[in-house]
Amino acid sequence: MTALREGTKAPDFALPAVSNSPAVSKSKEDGGKFSLKDALQHGQVLAIFFKVSCPVCQYSFPFFERLHKAYGSQKVAIVGVSQDDKKNTAAFLKEYGVTFPALLDDPAGYAASNAYGLTNVPSWFLIGQDGEIKISSVGWVRADVEDLNRMLSDANHTALRRLFHPGDDVRDSRPG
């Protein structure tokens, strides 16, 4: 099985969050979960699947945080989907300065990860409001992240934001 590709309908998921955020329901009925279906009513969703022990996840998350600061909460909800427990995920978010919401994919079955056909992390998917995957990427691929930056800029009708800075160790690719 391989990760879902562009043009595929994104499987729905509702996952608990590490902490409350505007993108996460505080409803008692759903247990305070983030619902992909509900989020898509407000805009696109960038779902980034990760493990805290993954060196490529550690490398890439500061760049995803830059995307969040540039475009998040406008017409795109950016969420991490952790394959770890709440305590370790919270420590990861703090260590890497991540401010976007992180969700927990139950390690007992990894239902969301399996639905998306994950073979490696990080794997990420930009999901359009129509529920279709617009971009998917496995590992770190600089060209994919640059394409994502352009798409988010276009979707938000804003100038393209600088994602990479002088002195950044930006590799063309790193397998997950």
Task: Locate predicted features.
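Structural microenvironment flanking redox-active thiols in thiol-disulfide oxidoreductases
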Residues: 58-96, 109-112
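A short beta-strand-turn-helix
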Residues: 13-45
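Short active-site neighborhood of thiol/selenol oxidoreductases, capturing the structured segment around
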Residues: 35-58, 64
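Short, internal strand/loop/helix patches
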Residues: 95-125
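Thiol-/selenol-based redox modules, centered on thioredoxin-like
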Residues: 129-176
